[in-house]
A protein has these predicted regions:
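Extracytoplasmic loops and strand-loop junctions of Gram-negative outer membrane beta-barrel proteins
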Residues: 21, 136-137
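Short, hydrophobic/aromatic-rich segments at coil-to-beta transitions
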Residues: 21-28, 46-51
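Solvent-exposed loop/turn segments connecting transmembrane beta-strands
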Residues: 25-39, 54-64, 96-103, 138-148
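Gram-negative (and chloroplast) outer-membrane scaffold detector with strong preference
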Residues: 42-126
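Outer-membrane beta-barrel "beta-signal"
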Residues: 66-68, 146-159
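C-terminal binding/interaction regions
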Residues: 129-131
Length: 159
């Protein structure tokens, strides 16, 4: 377990500074598939953002995903800002059990994002990301390829 935490920390230490080079940067949490854990989000410009999530896999292992989204629509409901994005992501999971050794998922995705501010000081985004994809499951019997589906609900704080 200590090795898994060290690997996870190294992934975060390498990925975050590279992603945070441009634009606004956010950190938060994400619950979903293929990854549940700490998420980092970075805006590259007004239309394009990237994200990375690292955490623990449901099957007993570690996981990480990276992706990018392009903003295609923006609208308001009352004073609240919402926007719709399309993009893609890829995730990898390494298991520490007998049945599944590892899994890789690649997916097209869309998301609905809600930006809000608390007391005109703190900027947050809540998002729901869903999409179809393909999964590669590595077991003792070989590689199984099949349809997959990604989904996540998250909250990030921009700093």
């Amino acid at each position: 377990m200590k090795k898994a935490l060290i690997i996870l920390a190294l992934i975060v230490l390498v990925v975050v500074p590279v992603m945070a080079k441009k634009g606004a940067t956010a950190i938060g949490g994400e619950a979903g598939y293929p990854a549940t854990g700490i998420t980092f989000r970075f805006d590259m410009n007004d239309k394009l953002n990237g994200f990375a999530t690292a955490g623990f896999w449901y099957y007993g292992g570690i996981e990480a995903l990276v992706g990018a989204e392009y903003k295609v629509a923006q609208f308001k409901i009352g004073n609240e800002d919402f926007y719709v994005c399309v993009g893609g992501e890829a995730g990898a999971m390494i298991a520490f059990n007998k049945d599944v050794k590892a899994k890789v998922v690649a997916a097209a995705e869309g998301s609905l994002n809600w930006d809000f501010t608390i007391n005109n000081k703190s900027d947050f985004t809540v998002y729901l990301r869903l999409g179809p994809g393909v999964g590669f499951t590595f077991t003792d019997e070989g590689v199984k390829i099949g349809p997959d589906f990604i989904g996540a609900l998250g909250l990030v704080y921009y700093f």
